[in-house]
Amino acid sequence: MNDTIASTVRLTQYSHGAGCGCKISPKVLEKILHSDMEKWVDPHLLVGNETKDDAAVYDIGNGIGIISTTDFFMPIVDDPFDFGRIAATNAISDIFAMGGKPIMAIAILGFPIKLLPPEVAQRIVDGGRFACRQAGITLAGGHSIDAPEPIFGLAVTGIINTDKVKKNASATAGCKLFLTKPLGIGVLTTAEKKGKLKAEHQGLATEVMCQMNTIGAKFAEIAGISAMTDVTGFGLLGHLSELCEGSGVRAEVYFDKIKTLDGVQRYIEKGCIPGGTERNFESYGHKIGAMSDLQKAILCDPQTSGGLLIAVDADSEQQVLEIAADDSIELFEVGRLFAKEHDSPILITVL
């Protein structure tokens, strides 16, 4: 099989899930990660999994921290090269979400060798290699297995000054919430998988998913950004609820300010809602105030390689907007943080 034939393979037909939408639901994941074993605390581990942050951070001394993360999933698009590029971009994003700089990656590949020829896998890995080059790092190795469905991703190592780490559990009341990418990736990729995506929307989600969140490293220099995380498989409300829970704050989300990819509402009306949307809502819906069906479909939509969600204090807002503009990133406000009401289980109100 040559590259031309490889590019005609519809990878999404070989997987039951798609991108970050195939994540195990937050509710089930919590049960999996629960342990009765005595916890061993490493004083050098600055960020672990207690707050469900994007990556782990380990203090190696002299004010330097190592960031470690891994992310992989099944095809979200049909083209093998694009799949590899998206999966790699998504994995590298976790380093930027902590405010760090990636330095190296290794690949994770699962491939159905009896169903698809190796040329398809080669294109997937090349896509990953391309994304790594964009991030200024080397794809230094990896591991592969024969699997029933295609799987690809990276384990990524990064570096950061320990006093610059941006966590998802350090947000403060009064901050505005901004997002760097529009929502609706799960909706558009579901429309593509169902064969309902219009010609004018072909490649739109791919373009957004391939945008590298490099600006996260610049945001690390701004003390007035009290928290940062990337929005991926649990949707905006899922990752925002983790931020609120870990930080002891509540949020208001302004739905009329939410930006979505072109055509999202139309595809929602046609039933192009990924299964991950309902799984997400079932996991954290009890923490969210009343919503319309449209609000739920957009705000719980699982994103793959989504944007950075940042909490910004008033004094730093202009600086943040200027840095984003210099990188040709259109930040948009999605809400605001407030002191938590201790007698209410609701963390997020959608207005």
From Swiss-Prot:
Q: Name one GO cellular component term.
A: cytoplasm
**UniProt catalytic activity:** hydrogenselenide + ATP + H2O = selenophosphate + AMP + phosphate + 2 H(+)
State the Gene Ontology BP annotations: selenocysteine biosynthetic process
- Binding of Mg(2+) occurs at 54, 94, 230
Query: According to UniProt, where does the site described as Important for catalytic activity lie?
Result: 23
One annotated GO molecular function: ATP binding
Q: Which CDD domains match?
A: SelD
Cited InterPro entries: PurM-like_C_dom, PurM-like_C_sf, PurM-like_N, PurM-like_N_sf, SelD_I, SPS/SelD
Class of the enzyme per the UniProt entry, highest EC level: transferase
Superkingdom in the source lineage? Bacteria
Q: Sorted alphabetically, which Pfam families does this protein's record hold? A: AIRS, AIRS_C
- Sorted alphabetically, which keywords does the UniProt record give? ATP-binding, Kinase, Magnesium, Metal-binding, Nucleotide-binding, Selenium, Transferase
Q: Which HAMAP family match?
A: SelD
Q: How does it assemble?
A: Homodimer.
Check the record and name the PANTHER family matching this protein: INACTIVE SELENIDE, WATER DIKINASE-LIKE PROTEIN-RELATED, SELENIDE, WATER DIKINASE
| Protein's name according to its UniProt entry | Selenide, water dikinase
